[in-house]
Amino acid sequence: MVNTSLLAALTAYAVAVSAAPTAPQVKGFSVNQVAVPKGVYRHPAAQLAKAYGKYHATVPTQVAAAAAATGSVTTNPTSNDEEYITQVTVGDDTLGLDFDTGSADLWVFSSQTPSSERSGHDYYTPGSSAQKIDGATWSISYGDGSSASGDVYKDKVTVGGVSYDSQAVESAEKVSSEFTQDTANDGLLGLAFSSINTVQPTPQKTFFDNVKSSLSEPIFAVALKHNAPGVYDFGYTDSSKYTGSITYTDVDNSQGFWGFTADGYSIGSDSSSDSITGIADTGTTLLLLDDSIVDAYYEQVNGASYDSSQGGYVFPSSASLPDFSVTIGDYTATVPGEYISFADVGNGQTFGGIQSNSGIGFSIFGDVFLKSQYVVFDASGPRLGFAAQA
């Protein structure tokens, strides 16, 4: 059963209802991301390694080597976007979670996680409202070496004032260093399709799948921001956050992702009618494309080159970058060139926000792309909607 208790700040978008035998209807709600301090410096190639690992692609040796570089913060902290998380209440605990449309698990650091692995993290302690699911386990392991696993509980989870009392919460017993070092994130809230949830022997539903019947529309919309916290709208679209109309395209969810096909693309003034098949993934930082497109993009950037020591394309920090656009039906979604300037790697060089998808088999439209768009994830189609941010 879904119980709702709407925050005062959200009353313009939601209607408080009392518990009922069926899921109560609410207009919708919004949750804002929160900026968090940067931790230990991580080379931008770590974002590449993370994405390759997430989709079980081999992490190239040069990417792995560059990603392993650590040390004091030597980059300009405004040269790439801050890290943003969203506050979620799990049981009696408030955690900072990464909302990820590229996965379908809600997993958290917990009191079951060894103290040495949860240091610096807020964590979930199963309390009186928690019910352990006997025999249920979960496990994730990625090609970059990151992994986590543990037990599963049913507990109350609250996002933006809307609660679900029996949400599957994957409590971490083991967490690899790739996750423990990121003290900004206390876990992940997956928003992909429940078909790829990793709980065994019985996969569990995502938070969105559990609450979508209580919303006026089974949708959520994402307005990530460049160098600023973004917002997630659940159950409605906010016309103040986009310009023009929303263009929709069918979703291929056969692999559990929000997959779609762009009809063509442009680099600056040069256009191509070649289509791009990819997924919309808020949990991936970069825009990862086929090598031919990546090469073509950086051919238009003076001084750009693939630097194996950096694990990707770099260019002079003073270089002017062309816009990158994709065509979706009659709509052109444009990523401003400045968004593709991702991170300073020293010696006057910048790591690009467009990089290779390493033969994953599809492109990944990560945050570099999404931060220019208002994107609607509509479960009723399923379909995706795109409009330029206001």
From Swiss-Prot:
GO terms for cellular component: extracellular region. Keywords: Aspartyl protease, Glycoprotein, Hydrolase, Protease, Secreted, Signal. Residues 1-19 form the signal peptide. Its EC number is 3.4.23.18. Residues 20-67 form a propeptide. The keyword Methyltransferase does not apply. SUPFAM superfamilies: Acid proteases. The keyword Transferase does not apply. Inhibited by the microbial peptide pepstatin. It catalyses: Hydrolysis of proteins with broad specificity. Generally favors hydrophobic residues in P1 and P1', but also accepts Lys in P1, which leads to activation of trypsinogen. Does not clot milk. Glycans are attached at residue 70. InterPro entries: Aspartic_peptidase_A1, Aspartic_peptidase_AS, Aspergillopepsin-like_cat_dom, PEPTIDASE_A1, Peptidase_aspartic_dom_sf. Its main location: secreted. Residues 84-387 form the Peptidase A1 domain. GO terms for molecular function: aspartic-type endopeptidase activity. One of its GO terms (biological process) is proteolysis. Secreted aspartic endopeptidase that allows assimilation of proteinaceous substrates. The scissile peptide bond is attacked by a nucleophilic water molecule activated by two aspartic residues in the active site. Shows a broad primary substrate specificity. Favors hydrophobic residues at the P1 and P1' positions, but also accepts a lysine residue in the P1 position, leading to the activation of trypsinogen and chymotrypsinogen A. This is Aspergillopepsin-1. It comes from Aspergillus oryzae (Yellow koji mold).
